[in-house]
A protein has these predicted regions:
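Membrane-embedded alpha-helical bundles that constitute the cytochrome b-like, heme-associated redox core
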Residues: 1-232
Length: 232
C-alpha cells in the first residue's frame, strides 16, 4: 500500500509539472501582450517619474515598500505568537508556521532596507547615505520618528540573526532577544504613524491599528492559556 501511495504521488507530481509550465507560459504571454499594449502610453510618465526634473518614483517605491515591510513584520510576529499559543496546530501546522515566521521576517527586513536606501534617489527629501544608516540624523524630516524606524530595523536584524546562533547563546537568552520583537513592532508602528505620509488616510490608519489590535489579541490569548491552563 505504501508503494502504491508513493507511485500515486509521483504520478500526480509528474502530471502537475506540465500544468505549471503551461500556466507559467500563459502568464508570460499575457504579461508580454499587456506590456506591448500599455507600455508605450505609460513610457513618458514612467521616464519622467524616474529621471525627470521632479522624479517621484523613488518616493512612491519607498512608501510602498514601507507598507509591505510593516505588513511582513506583523505577519512574522503573528506566526511567532500562534506557534507559542498552540493556535498553529489548527492552521497552518507548527513546522509550517515556524518556517513562515523565519522566511517572512527575512523578506520583511529586505523590504525595510529597500524602503530606506531607495530614498537616496529622491531629490526632494535629499537624504545622504549617512542619514540613511545613522539614526536620528535626518534633521530636515522628523528625525525622532525616522530614527525610531531606523533603530527598529537594526533590532529586527539582531532578532533575525538570533535564529542562527540559538545553540550558541542558549534558549533563555534567545527568548529574551525575541521579546524585543514587541519593541520593534511598537517602534515601527510609531514610525509609520508619525513619519508616514499616508498615515492620515483611513485605510492606512486601519492597517496600522488593526494589525496592532490583532497582535494584542494574540498576545492576551497566549498569556491567558499560560496563566489559566486547560485541564483534561
Amino acid at each position: 500500500m505504501a508503494k502504491l501511495s508513493n507511485d500515486t504521488n509521483q504520478l500526480e507530481a509528474s502530471a502537475a509539472r506540465p500544468q505549471r509550465m503551461l500556466l507559467f507560459l500563459a502568464a508570460v504571454v499575457v504579461g508580454t501582450l499587456f506590456a506591448a499594449v500599455y507600455l508605450p502610453a505609460w513610457k513618458p510618465a514612467l521616464v519622467a517619474s524616474i529621471v525627470g526634473d521632479a522624479p517621484k518614483a523613488y518616493w512612491f517605491l519607498s512608501r510602498g515598500s514601507a507598507l509591505v515591510a510593516f505588513g511582513l513584520l506583523w505577519l512574522s510576529m503573528a506566526y511567532g505568537v500562534i506557534i507559542t499559543n498552540k493556535m498553529a496546530r489548527v492552521w497552518p501546522g507548527g513546522p509550517t508556521a515556524f518556517d513562515l515566521h523565519e522566511y517572512v521576517s527575512i523578506l520583511g527586513i529586505a523590504f525595510a532596507l529597500f524602503h530606506g536606501f531607495i530614498l537616496l534617489g529622491d531629490r526632494f527629501i535629499n537624504f545622504r547615505i549617512a542619514q540613511i544608516i545613522i539614526p536620528f540624523t535626518t534633521v530636515d524630516y522628523k528625525p525622532l520618528w525616522v530614527g525610531l524606524g531606523q533603530l527598529a530595523i537594526y533590532l529586527w536584524v539582531i532578532i533575525m540573526a538570533s535564529f542562527y546562533i540559538r545553540s550558541s547563546i542558549g534558549g533563555k537568552s534567545w527568548r529574551w532577544v525575541h521579546y524585543l520583537s514587541y519593541l520593534v513592532f511598537g517602534m515601527a508602528l510609531a514610525h509609520g504613524l508619525a513619519a508616514g505620509t499616508d498615515s492620515a488616510a483611513p485605510w492606512a490608519a486601519g492597517m496600522y491599528w488593526g494589525s496592532a489590535a490583532s497582535l494584542l489579541f494574540l498576545l492576551i490569548y497566549r498569556i491567558s492559556i499560560k496563566v489559566f491552563p486547560q485541564t483534561a
